[in-house]
């Protein structure tokens, strides 16, 4: 793993590297190896984060605003973009017509990371990342339904994470993680769809998930 950053932000760059390595190790244990043997983190004059195969950008504002704490966008987005090496890099999806599929998985993967490595911050994650934005709407939305980023993020990323959490609460942890592993193994190197994901989820449990699914995708 290589971290590319401006000299003035060396402390934050090292932190971004540390969070990324921790996330790589955690996700590798949960989901298997990432698609590439290397990963580059690049500080960029960019508004947020952006994933690529074996590479991601982090906004320079995350570096300049970093206070040394895991309660930060630098940590959150480093973990999020690392998760894309699985939910994008290994299992693809239609990022225009079904943008929630990889983004919700990566957003929820942030929580999984914090639960594992900093469990005392799980409640903080919900209170900082999701709840203040009161996400709502149907996950059937496409990118063409949005003219601004904030409503898009609130629905696709945050409402999507709430949906995954609802599934997990109904299924239980063992079935939920089994569903994620099945989904990844079944569609590794392919473009998956909502139906593919929901099939893997439903096959992992005998619990009735119809209410959560209907609520998430209601017109």
What role is predicted for each listed range?
Residues 1-85, 89-98, 150:
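Juxtacatalytic substrate-recognition/specificity segment
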Residues 9, 121, 153-219:
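Amphipathic alpha-helical substructures
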Residues 15, 19, 40, 123-129, ...:
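Extended, well-ordered alpha-helical scaffold segments
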Residues 17, 21-24, 55, 79-80, ...:
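Extracytoplasmic/secreted envelope proteins and their assembly/folding machinery
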Residues 20, 51, 71, 75, ...:
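Active-site-proximal structural scaffolding
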Residues 28-31, 81-82, 86, 90, ...:
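Sec/Tat-exported extracytoplasmic proteins
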Residues 33-42, 94-98, 120-124, 178-179, ...:
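Surface-exposed patches in mature extracellular/periplasmic domains of secreted proteins
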Residues 99, 103-171, 187, 216-217:
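Acidic/His/Gly-enriched intrinsically disordered linker/tail segments
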């Amino acid at each position: 793993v290589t971290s590319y950053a401006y000299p003035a932000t060396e402390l934050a760059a090292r932190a971004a590297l540390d969070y990324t390595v921790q996330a790589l190790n955690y996700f590798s244990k949960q989901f298997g190896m990432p698609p590439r043997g290397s990963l580059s983190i690049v500080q960029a004059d960019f508004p947020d984060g952006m994933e690529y195969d074996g590479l991601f950008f982090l906004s320079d504002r995350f570096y300049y605003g970093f206070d040394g704490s895991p309660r930060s966008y630098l940590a959150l987005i480093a973990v999020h973009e690392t998760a894309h090496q699985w939910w994008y890099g290994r299992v693809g999806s239609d990022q225009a017509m079904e943008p929630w599929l990889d983004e919700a998985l990566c957003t929820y993967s942030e929580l999984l990371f914090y639960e594992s490595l900093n469990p005392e911050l799980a409640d903080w994650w919900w209170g900082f990342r999701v709840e203040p934005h009161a996400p709502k709407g149907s996950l059937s939305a496409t990118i063409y339904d949005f003219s601004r980023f904030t409503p898009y993020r609130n629905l696709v990323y945050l409402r999507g994470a709430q949906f995954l959490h609802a599934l997990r609460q109904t299924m239980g942890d063992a079935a939920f993680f089994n569903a994620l592993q099945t989904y990844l193994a079944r569609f590794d190197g392919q473009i998956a769809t909502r139906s593919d994901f929901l099939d893997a989820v439903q096959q992992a449990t005998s619990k009735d998930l119809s209410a959560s699914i209907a609520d998430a995708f209601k017109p």
